[in-house]
Amino acid sequence: MSKQPRTAPGRATRQRIVQAATELVAERGVAATSLDDVRERAHASKSQLYLYFSDRDDLMRAVSESTCDAVMEVQSESLAAFDSLEGIERYLDATVALQEQRDARGGCPIGSLVGQVAEHDEGARLALADGFDRWEAGLRAGLEAMVQRCELRADTDPALLARQILASLQGGLLLTQVRRDSGQLRAAADGVLALIRAQRTA
């Protein structure tokens, strides 16, 4: 289990190690990222690495947590506005635009980690599941607000709709990555809008 440092310099060192590992995993994948690679990128000693992380799996759990935090931070502003049709359209447009900026490479950082760590490390799987839970909760909160304002039908299930939206986006992100075509995500986004419009009161 990773150790949380008590001093500011210790916290900075641990964060530098996690950031280096997160960058390397995004660039090369988990299998191609060694602890020596991380130490070199982070300018950290072996003793510093093992002071905060018991082994490689422990570090990858921290990478999973860090990745989820970063994904939520990037979309925090647009997700907070996911409570009107206009806000939802802006959120979806921003999500597609980000993939266009990345030339349809990388996919969803959380989703990309799932296949690499979830089947052999329960701690990492739980960290990634928590990231998706937080994402889904943000979507659900906006939909609940729309139901309360009678912008969506009273029989709308915000929890189910949020799950459908997240699943659609993840599928779109995966197809965008493998086909190198952001139009895949745009098709998923259009499907999300159709789902929401079907629940509108007017």
Predicted region positions:
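Helix-turn-helix
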Residues: R16, A20-D58, A62
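Hydrophobic alpha-helical bundle segments that form small-molecule/ligand-binding pockets
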Residues: H120-L126, D133-L161, A198-A202
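Short, basic, alpha-helical segments at the C-terminal edge of helix-turn-helix-like DNA-binding modules
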Residues: E65-V71
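Amphipathic alpha-helical segments used for helix-helix packing
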Residues: G87, R102-G123
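Hydrophobic alpha-helical segments that form the core
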Residues: G111, G138, T156-L175, G191-A194
